[in-house]
Curated annotation (Swiss-Prot):
Any one Gene Ontology cellular component term annotated for this protein: cytosol
UniProt membrane topology term: Peripheral membrane protein
Protein name: Protein translocase subunit SecA
A matching Pfam family: SecA_SW
Role: Part of the Sec protein translocase complex. Interacts with the SecYEG preprotein conducting channel. Has a central role in coupling the hydrolysis of ATP to the transfer of proteins into and across the cell membrane, serving both as a receptor for the preprotein-SecB complex and as an ATP-driven molecular motor driving the stepwise translocation of polypeptide chains across the membrane.
Binding site for ATP: 86, 104-108, 499
Family, per entry: Belongs to the SecA family.
HAMAP family: SecA
Gene name for this UniProt entry: secA
PROSITE patterns: SECA, SECA_MOTOR_DEAD
Length: 862
C-alpha cells in the first residue's frame, strides 16, 4: 500500500527536492544579471539585502538573489560555481533541516549559501566542525568569498584567547568546533561580569558532520571539573588484587560493558582484602563501611577486562588518552569519570591523578537545542533519521548527486577466523596494487590497523597508516590516498572532511613541494609540472578502477560502514567497495544471532574459504539495526534524565545572569525576609527550654550565620518563644542596617560589587555541590524500578526537592557571607587574565577557569 502511494505521490524527500528545483530555476534565470555586475556592485548587494530586511522583507523573500550573489562571488573568488544540487543543499540548510550529501559533493561550499543568507540579519551564524584543522581551513578558504561580499568571518580554535574569542563571536559568521562552543558556554556561566563573557547568543548553527556531533558524541557530556581530595593509593592496592581473579570470579556483559563479581569472586576478593588489611576481618564487602571498596573493585575489573589499550585508549606522554570509538581520533583533555580513568592509570602503572568534581556541565544534545535555528550536513544521516527528528526536530533530506555514483559495492566475504580474513585482505590488496589501483583500508581500532600494517610490511607492500597516533598528518595522508598504487590504512573514518581525489590533491601536493621555493617563475613551472602529473595519475587511477575501499570489520552502526564506502566514487568517479568479515569479529560474536552461525555451518565453511550470501549480508545489517535501535533507546533515556538537569541548569543560569545584570542590589529587602525565615528555623530546631546547653547551641548558630554574640542575660528574661523570635529579629535587623549603612557611607560602589560577588560565588558553590548530588542520584535511580517505581519520575521529584533545598541554602549562605564581611578586606575587581581554554580539569592550585584570576581553591574550588 505504501509503495503504491510512493509511486503516485512520490516520497516526502522527492517532493521537497522537487519544490526546491523550482527555486533553483529562478536562481539560474537571474544568473546572467549578476555576471554583469562589477566586484564593488556585487559587494554592495549585501548592503541592499540588509536594507530590504529592515524594511520588512524576510530571508525567504531575498533567498533567490542572495544565492545568486554567493554563486557569482564564488566563481570569481574561488573559481567554483555552485551546482544546482548544491543550491538545493543550501536551501535545505536554510530551512533548518539536515542535508545528506555524498562525499565529494562540496558540503563546505554548500554551507556558504545558507550562512551568507542568515548572516544578513546580523545575529550571527555558527558553522560547527569536528576539529580545529577543519575550522581553520574552512574559515580561511571560504573567508575569501565572504570578504568579497562584505561579511566578517571569525574562527575560534582551542588555543584562542578570551579577547580573540569575544571578537570572533561578534563576526557575522563564526567557524569553530562543537567542543569550543560548548565549553565557552559553560565558562561564560562561571564569569563574574557580563563584560567578561564571550558568546552573544544562539541564533543559527550549521553543524558539519552532524551525525558525528549530534549522535556519536551525544552521550559524551561536556564537563569542566576540579580535583577533589581522594585516596588514590587505593587504586593501586586494588589493581594488584585483580590479577588474582580468574574467569569464574566475574560475569562479563560485553553488550552493555558491565561486569559483576560472582559469589565465588566475592568470597575470594573479601579474603584478599582482609589479608591485605584493606577491610576488617569478619566483615562483608557489602557492609556499609566497605561499599566504597566495591566501587574500586568494579572499576578495576572494567579497566582490565573491558577496556583495551590501542582500542579504547592509548598512552601518550605518560597519560591515558581516550580514543573516539567512532572516528578513531584522540580525545585530548577528556577523562573517564567515576574512577575509571584512575583504574586505567593503575592498570598501566602510570601516575594516578585525582578524581574530579563537576563544576559545570552540559551535553551537545541540550547545547545545540538552544539555537533558534539548527541545521546540519553529512554524507550519512538517513539511517539515523528517526533520532534526528525525535530529539532535534531535524528532518533529513537526501540530496541527489551532481553526477550519478559509479561505485560498485561487492558482497561481503565471510571467513571462519580473523587470521583467514586478514590473509584474504592482504591478497586482495596485493591484486589491486599490481594494477596500480589506489586502496583505502578501514579498521575499527588502532590495534587492528597496526596488525594489518605489520602484515603489509611482511608482504613488502608500502603503505601509510592513519590513526589516532598520527593525527597531525591526517589531512595530508587522506588527501593523497587517491594516487595510483597508494595503500592507506585508516582507523574508522579518520580524515573526514578531506576529499580523496583520484590522482592526488594538487593543492596539498603543491604546498608541500613548493614550501621552500621563493622564485615566482620556478613556482609556476613546478606547479604546471605537478598539475600535469596529477592529471596523468588521475587517468591511471580511473583505468585501474578508481579508489578501492576495503572494510575489515562491520561496525555496530551501518552509518559508519556507509561513511567508509562513501570515500570512493566521488563526483562520478569509478570505484569499488568490499567488506571482509570473520565469525570472530565483535559484531558477529556479540550481536550476531545463532541463526547466522547455524546457516554458515550448514553451508560448510572450510579453512581459507569465504562464503558470500545476500541473506547473510541482510542478517548482519539486521544485527546492526538492532544495535542502533538499542543505542538510540539509551541516548533517548539519558536525554530524558538530562532534560531534568537542563531545566534546573536554565533556572540557575537565569538567576545568575539576573544577578550579573543588576549593578545595585537593595540587599536590605532580601535580608528582612531571609532573616525572619532563618531566625524562625533556628528557634524551631534549637529552642526547647532555654537552659545553658540550649543557649550555647543558639549562640553558636548566630555566631556562625550572623557573626553576632547573644547576651544570655537578656534572652533568659524573655517569657516565650515568640518573644525570643521577636528580639532576635530585632537585633539581626539592627545589625544588618548598621553594616549596610557603614559600607555604603564609605564606598557604595564597592559594597554593590561585594554583594554581587558574594551572591555569584555562593550560587556557584552550591550549584557545584548540587551537580555532584544529582550525579549520585542518577547513578542509583534505576534500582527504584525493583520497587515498581518509575526511575524517571522518581528522579524528577527528588531533583526538584534538591533544587528547592539548594535555593534555600543559597539565601542562607549569602546572609552568612555578607554578615562576616569586613571592610578592611580588599574587594577590588581583578584584571581578567588569559587562561588555557583547553582546561576541562583544574587542579586546586591552578587559576580558576571563571577568569577571576584567583587560584581554583580560593574561588570555585572553595
Amino acid at each position: 500500500m505504501l509503495s503504491i502511494a510512493h509511486k503516485i505521490f512520490g516520497s516526502a524527500n522527492s517532493r521537497i527536492i522537487k519544490s526546491f528545483y523550482k527555486v533553483v530555476q529562478h536562481i539560474n534565470a537571474i544568473e546572467h544579471e549578476f555576471q554583469l555586475l562589477s566586484n564593488e556592485a556585487l559587494k554592495n548587494k549585501t548592503i541592499e539585502f540588509k536594507e530590504e530586511l529592515k524594511n520588512g522583507k524576510t530571508l525567504d523573500d531575498i533567498l533567490v538573489p542572495a544565492f545568486a550573489v554567493v554563486r557569482e562571488a564564488s566563481k570569481r573568488v574561488l573559481n567554483m560555481r555552485h551546482f544546482d544540487v548544491q543550491l538545493i543543499g543550501g536551501m535545505v540548510l536554510h530551512k533548518g533541516m539536515i542535508s545528506e550529501m555524498k562525499t565529494g559533493e562540496g558540503k563546505t561550499l554548500v554551507a556558504t549559501l545558507a550562512a551568507y543568507l542568515n548572516a544578513l540579519e546580523g545575529k550571527g551564524v555558527h558553522i560547527v566542525t569536528v576539529n580545529d584543522y577543519l575550522a581553520k581551513r574552512d574559515a580561511e578558504w571560504m573567508g575569501e568569498l565572504y570578504d568579497a561580499l562584505g561579511i566578517t568571518v571569525g574562527c575560534i580554535l582551542t588555543d584562542t584567547n578570551d579577547l580573540e574569542r569575544k571578537n570572533a563571536y561578534q563576526c557575522d559568521i563564526l567557524y569553530s568546533t562543537n567542543n569550543n562552543l560548548g565549553f565557552d558556554y559553560l565558562r561564560d556561566n562561571m564569569k563574574f561580569s557580563r563584560s567578561e563573557m564571550v558568546q552573544r547568543g544562539f541564533n543559527y548553527a550549521i553543524v558539519d558532520e552532524v551525525d558525528s556531533i549530534l549522535i556519536d558524541e551525544a552521550r559524551t557530556p561536556l564537563i569542566i571539573s576540579g580535583q577533589v581530595d581522594q585516596d588514590i593509593k587505593m587504586y593501586k592496592k586494588i589493581d594488584n588484587l585483580i590479577y588474582e581473579l580468574v574467569e569464574e570470579d566475574y560475569e562479563l556483559e560485553e553488550k552493555s560493558k558491565n561486569i559483576f563479581l560472582t559469589e565465588a569472586g566475592t568470597t575470594k576478593i573479601e579474603n584478599l582484602l582482609t589479608k591485605h588489611n584493606l577491610i576488617p576481618s569478619n566483615t562483608s564487602l557489602y557492609d556499609i563501611d566497605n561499599i566504597i571498596i566495591m566501587h574500586y573493585i568494579i572499576q578495576a575489573l572494567r579497566a582490565h577486562k573491558i577496556f583495551a589499550l590501542d582500542k579504547d585508549y592509548i598512552i601518550k606522554n605518560g597519560n591515558i588518552v581516550i580514543i573516539d570509538e567512532f572516528t578513531g581520533r584522540m580525545m585530548d583533555g577528556r577523562r573517564y569519570s567515576d574512577g575509571l580513568h584512575q583504574a586505567l592509570e593503575a592498570k598501566e602503572k602510570l601516575n594516578i591523578n585525582s578524581e574530579n568534581q563537576t563544576l559545570a556541565s552540559t551535553t551537545f544534545q541540550n547545547y545545540f537545542r538552544m539555537y533558534t535555528k539548527l541545521s546540519g550536513m553529512t554524507g550519512t544521516a538517513a539511517t539515523e533519521s528517526e533520532e534526528f527528528l525525535g530529539i532535534y526536530n531535524l528532518q533529513v533530506v537526501q540530496i541527489p548527486t551532481n553526477i550519478p555514483v559509479q561505485r560498485i559495492d561487492l558482497n561481503d566475504d565471510i571467513y571462519c577466523t580473523e587470521e583467514e580474513k586478514f590473509s584474504a585482505v592482504i591478497k586482495f590488496i596485493s591484486e589491486c596494487h599490481q594494477k596500480l589501483q589506489p586502496v583505502l583500508v578501514g579498521t575499527v581500532s588502532i590495534e587492528k590497523s597496526e596488525m594489518l600494517s605489520k602484515l603489509l610490511t611482511q608482504n613488502k607492500l608500502k603503505h601509510s597508516v592513519l590513526n589516532a597516533r598520527y593525527h597531525e598528518q591526517e589531512a595530508y595522508i587522506i588527501a593523497q590516498a587517491g594516487i595510483p598504487g597508494t595503500i592507506t590504512i585508516a582507523t574508522n573514518m579518520a580524515g573526514r572532511g578531506t576529499d580523496i581525489q583520484l590522482g592526488g590533491n594538487l593543492k596539498m601536493l603543491a604546498k608541500t613541494a613548493l614550501a621552500n621555493t621563493t622564485d615566482k617563475e620556478a613556482i609556476e613551472i613546478k606547479y604546471k609540472q605537478l598539475s600535469e602529473k596529477v592529471k596523468k595519475d588521475k587517468e591511471i587511477a580511473i583505468q585501474a578502477g578508481g579508489l578501492c575501499v576495503i572494510g575489515t570489520e562491520r561496525h555496530e552502526s551501518r552509518r559508519i560502514d556507509n561513511q567508509l564506502r562513501g570515500r570512493s566514487g566521488r563526483q562520478g568517479d569509478p570505484g569499488l567497495s568490499k567488506f571482509f568479515l570473520s565469525l570472530e569479529d565483535d559484531l558477529l560474536r556479540i550481536f550476531g544471532s545463532d541463526k547466522i552461525k547455524g546457516v554458515l555451518k550448514k553451508l560448510g565453511m572450510k579453512k581459507d574459504e569465504a562464503i558470500q550470501h545476500t541473506w547473510i549480508s541482510r542478517s548482519i545489517e539486521k544485527a546492526q539495526h538492532k544495535v542502533e535501535s538499542r543505542n538510540y533507546d539509551i541516548r533517548k533515556s539519558l536525554l530524558k534524565f538530562d532534560n531534568v538537569i537542563n531545566e534546573q541548569r536554565k533556572v540557575v543560569f537565569d538567576q545568575r545572569n539576573r544577578i550579573l545584570d543588576n549593578d545595585s542590589y537593595d540587599i536590605s529587602i532580601i535580608y528582612r525576609d531571609l532573616n525572619s525565615e532563618i531566625v524562625n528555623s533556628i528557634i524551631h530546631d534549637k529552642y526547647y527550654n532555654l537552659d545553658d546547653e540550649t543557649y550555647k547551641i543558639l549562640s553558636s548558630e548566630f555566631t556562625r550565620i550572623y557573626a553576632l554574640t547573644l547576651d544570655y542575660s537578656i534572652i533568659s528574661e524573655l517569657e516565650s518563644k515568640e518573644k525570643v523570635i521577636e528580639y532576635l529579629n530585632k537585633i539581626v535587623d539592627e545589625h544588618f542596617t548598621q553594616k549596610i549603612e557603614e559600607f555604603k557611607s564609605r564606598d557604595q560602589k564597592l559594597w554593590d560589587y561585594a554583594v554581587k560577588k558574594v551572591m555569584i560565588m555562593s550560587l556557584d558553590y552550591l550549584w557545584r555541590d548540587h551537580l555532584a548530588a544529582l550525579d549520585s542520584l542518577k547513578c542509583g535511580i534505576n534500582l527504584r524500578s525493583i520497587a515498581q517505581k518509575d526511575p524517571l519520575n522518581e528522579f524528577k521529584a527528588e531533583a526538584f526537592s534538591m533544587l528547592e533545598n539548594m535555593m534555600n541554602k543559597f539565601y542562607e549562605l549569602i546572609t552568612q557571607r555578607l554578615s562576616h564581611l569586613r571592610f578592611d578586606i580588599e574587594l577590588s575587581e581583578t584584571q581578567i587574565p588569559e587562561y588555557n581554554i583547553n582546561h576541562t580539569k583544574i587542579s586546586r592550585n591552578e587559576k580558576c577557569p571563571c577568569g577571576s584570576g584567583k587560584k581554583f581553591k580560593h574561588c570555585h574550588g572553595m
